[in-house]
């Protein structure tokens, strides 16, 4: 195995870093019933807190992407972790919906600064033939973070709900881990003329030199990927209880079943991308989840549908890790943290719109039809990938 001597420390540092991305998003969802009562807000107002986080992440992908390229990717990750920890801890000192809205936007900025630098660091330190599995392992911490959030919620939510957020301040000492494990970046210029190292990367860099089409299509792939994920993952539990008759008691453990499948799916499709190529692996993941969700539409056996959640989870996140390697290879080295983070986080538009859209379709035509739409979304995503170039064709001997 080639790559740099820092490849393993970087792997673990980025794995831990990305865990806080999913932890933050999950604790907001877990605490939402309490927030509705404490802040005396409506369901739409509660939903706006999630939307503010998504908007912040989109802005953060630009801000932290430029920081990563001009001041260093390690520095960007450290700053994002400290920023995130401050945002999580500040929850203890606010008590109005307006303050929450502003805080969630600001915290979202930090969230948007994590994905791109993580993907770029893996690309820098891991060779192409192992890069898919390395990136997928890093981003599989999404599933771990969600499980940790669920466990912390069970422990503290009935005691002091703010502790659920305050626990996220662990991201601040985690920044020290990044400083310890990730090597300093090569010299990056902060001057416009490029006399002190590399030229400054500007906000339009991902649209210059013929990159506009690539950036646009890659962003669309992220929109489809995240729309499919949140459309399916958000509504499948409700579908199984309302239209397939699974009890709430049975569904209590369903999220853990899905997260187990997600973690395994990350690893499988990461290895597959190193074996047969990035695009083929992601297309396989999209087709897998489309077929798996379709099974929910036609099968009615409750116990089977419960455990089928492993297969659905397996496909849901299969492409997410591979995209980390793919986007880093798709763009030039000097902008890969910015470009990858931009394409991924702008895709959160799909995450924001899908739950409402699928819910509306479900209200009018039934959730069975709504889930069928997510299958179509994934098939469209598979077709869309064919419009982008392959970056690594795979090594079947690996």
Where are these regions (language model features)?
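Extracytoplasmic gate region of multi-pass secondary transporters
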Residues: 29, 211-266
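Interfacial helix-cap and linker-helix signal at transmembrane-aqueous boundaries
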Residues: 35-36, 67-68, 152-158, 240-241, ...
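Helix-breaking motifs and short loop linkers at transmembrane-helix boundaries and internal kinks
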Residues: 40, 72, 93-99, 127, ...
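Conserved MFS/SLC helix-loop-helix module at the cytosolic interface between two early adjacent transmembrane helices
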Residues: 59-95, 276
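Cytoplasmic helix-loop-helix junction between adjacent transmembrane helices
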Residues: 103-140
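Glycine-rich segments within core transmembrane alpha-helices of 12-TM secondary carriers
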Residues: 131-154, 344-354
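Helix-loop-helix hairpin linking two adjacent transmembrane segments in secondary transporters
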Residues: 138-180
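C-terminal membrane-cytosol helix-exit motif in multi-pass small-molecule transporters
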Residues: 170-188, 382-389
């Amino acid at each position: 195995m080639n790559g740099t001597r820092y490849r393993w420390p970087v792997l673990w540092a980025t794995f831990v870093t990305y865990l806080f991305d999913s932890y933050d998003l999950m604790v907001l969802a877990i605490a939402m019933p309490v927030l509705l009562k404490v802040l005396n807000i409506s369901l739409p107002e509660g939903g706006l807190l999630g939307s503010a986080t998504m908007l912040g992440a989109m802005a953060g992908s630009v801000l932290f992407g430029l920081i990563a390229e001009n001041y260093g990717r390690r520095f960007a990750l450290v700053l994002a972790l400290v920023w995130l920890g401050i945002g999580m801890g500040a929850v203890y000192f606010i008590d109005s919906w307006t303050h929450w809205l502003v805080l969630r936007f600001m915290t979202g900025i930090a969230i948007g600064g994590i994905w791109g630098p993580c993907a770029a660091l893996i690309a820098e330190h891991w060779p192409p033939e192992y890069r898919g599995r390395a990136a997928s392992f890093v981003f599989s911490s999404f599933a771990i973070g969600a499980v940790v959030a669920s466990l912390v919620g069970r422990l503290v939510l009935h005691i002091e709900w703010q502790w659920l957020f305050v626990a996220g301040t662990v991201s601040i000492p985690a920044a020290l881990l990044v400083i310890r494990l990730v090597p300093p970046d090569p010299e990056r210029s902060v001057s416009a003329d490029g006399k002190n190292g590399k030229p400054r990367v500007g906000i339009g860099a991902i649209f210059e030199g013929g990159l506009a089409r690539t950036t646009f299509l890659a962003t669309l792939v992220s929109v489809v990927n995240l729309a499919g994920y949140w459309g399916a993952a958000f509504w499948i539990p409700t579908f199984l209880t309302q239209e397939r008759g699974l009890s709430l008691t049975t569904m209590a453990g369903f999220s853990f079943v899905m997260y187990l499948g997600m973690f395994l799916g990350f690893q499988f499709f990461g290895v597959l991308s190193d074996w047969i190529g990035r695009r083929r692996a992601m297309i396989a993941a999209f087709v897998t989840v489309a077929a798996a969700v379709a099974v929910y539409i036609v099968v009615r056996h409750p116990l089977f549908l419960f455990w089928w959640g492993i297969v659905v989870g397996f496909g849901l996140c299969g492409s997410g890790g591979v995209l980390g390697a793919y986007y880093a290879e798709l763009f030039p080295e000097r902008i890969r943290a910015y470009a990858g983070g931009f394409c991924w986080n702008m895709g959160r538009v799909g995450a924001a719109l899908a739950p409402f859209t699928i819910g509306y379709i479900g209200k009018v035509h039934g959730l069975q039809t709504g889930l069928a739409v997510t299958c179509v979304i994934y098939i469209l995503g598979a077709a869309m990938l064919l419009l982008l170039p392959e970056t690594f064709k795979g090594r079947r001997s690996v």
